[in-house]
């Protein structure tokens, strides 16, 4: 493709859309990041940055965080809601709450909080869904507005800790997920001498569409039905505690792709709010939960990997629906709260790693079959003759199907002993030559070619063996078929020479990236420039800042990767800071209750028994270094 341009590369990987301007491709074909979105012209080349890290002793794979992107995302959400409030003359304010379950890393939480430090009135709170998260939030929330929302199932200890948080000066909302929690809250509040701030999570009839739609709807794991809501109201009235009910919460599910679903959910929850107010409650906060999506594939569509709306439209819909409803039912307008963790964190982190090798299916030169060869082999040779000639476009489809059918029959005859190994190998090579020729001859402009083109792209894709664990670093790609953008970090100024699939280094056939962003869609292979041992390039996995670290598992005992924080200083210089070493072999052994110290003693016994005395020290040193080493590959040249 001699007329390949950088614009072609940008379109091929759709980077301008899924990255929202945070990542891009430079004119020399290098992937860049704008680490401080307030200075978009200040870009960093990820390829050179990764190489510099390696030179400084940080082994790949490495997860790189850009905290200034977190700041920008927080402020963008707050600004969108503030503008919507002004536009619709909404008579209250907005609070952004970060649910730390999305990414509990201290660096991430602290940077999110730091984005609001300079604000006269911070618009940021924190959410916890478990006792460990609550303990973290109680210590960290003082750096924000001190608003804490407690979700999830709760026992007595969780509830007491939340109430103690109120005594520590925080505004702690205990959201009731089930009826039994109310009694415990009231008992413990009385014992501690605290007036609780209560919230209700209502279970809406409406259910948004998406991978996480089970979070909402009538069969949701969480929340109270309409009848249970009335029971709570009556119980609070009997205890003369109705004033404590300050927050209404609902959750449609994470990654809601369709703005109509959001609008409909807010409308139904708004009716709950108005009815509660009519019953005498004094609800002050309307918490819409999560749902603000990330456009992972950049298609701006209703697919589960995308969203058909922007941030401004999201805020406008929520504010306008609530404004109209409160006016219609003559109720005061509550403070709006959203818990938009995925949107805040996804873009800020990228995994950078190396390719340890490739396997390409290249056809070999073939000779025609012997005259006395089975007719089946002559049929396959005829397919090759036809496809290498000037077959018309429709004939190409027939040739493909005939050749695949013949190859299937070859395999069957081989299995029953009627064809030998050499004949099978010859047939497979002919089929490969036919497929390669067809791949170059077919065109996606012909609708009837497209299914076969997709098959050929998969069949002929190169295998890239990449130094990472899918299960540790991209667990959602394996578990729920989530799409994450993948790109080579350099060489994009040259036309792709092949298509490839990315395979991790675990001993599991599931360790394969099955879906790739390409153009305005999702493909099963990725276009890539030429890769050789002499001119290798690195691979980047993008938008991995939400959920992936905490959900990652240790399949094959591949542990946490190295990580680093990269910041742009006031002079536009790149600062690599807060480098955290990933797990060592000893670390991951300890996670599964294997004792590296006792292993070392065993090694010493074995070395003394089996190794010559002059070799023992070196062997023991290598074994000890093995326990201290990185779990990923470090020397594979």
Swiss-Prot record:
Associated pathway: Amine and polyamine biosynthesis; agmatine biosynthesis; agmatine from L-arginine: step 1/1
Pfam families found in the cross-reference section: Arg_decarb_HB, Arg_decarbox_C, Orn_Arg_deC_N
GO-annotated molecular function: arginine decarboxylase activity; metal ion binding
Catalysed conversion reaction: L-arginine + H(+) = agmatine + CO2
Residues annotated for substrate binding in this entry: 286-296
Cofactor(s) for this UniProt protein: Mg(2+); pyridoxal 5'-phosphate
UniProt entry keywords in alphabetical sequence: Decarboxylase, Lyase, Magnesium, Metal-binding, Polyamine biosynthesis, Pyridoxal phosphate, Spermidine biosynthesis
Function description: Catalyzes the biosynthesis of agmatine from arginine.
Protein name: Biosynthetic arginine decarboxylase
Species for this entry: Shewanella pealeana (strain ATCC 700345 / ANG-SQ1)
Higher taxonomy: Bacteria, Pseudomonadati, Pseudomonadota, Gammaproteobacteria, Alteromonadales
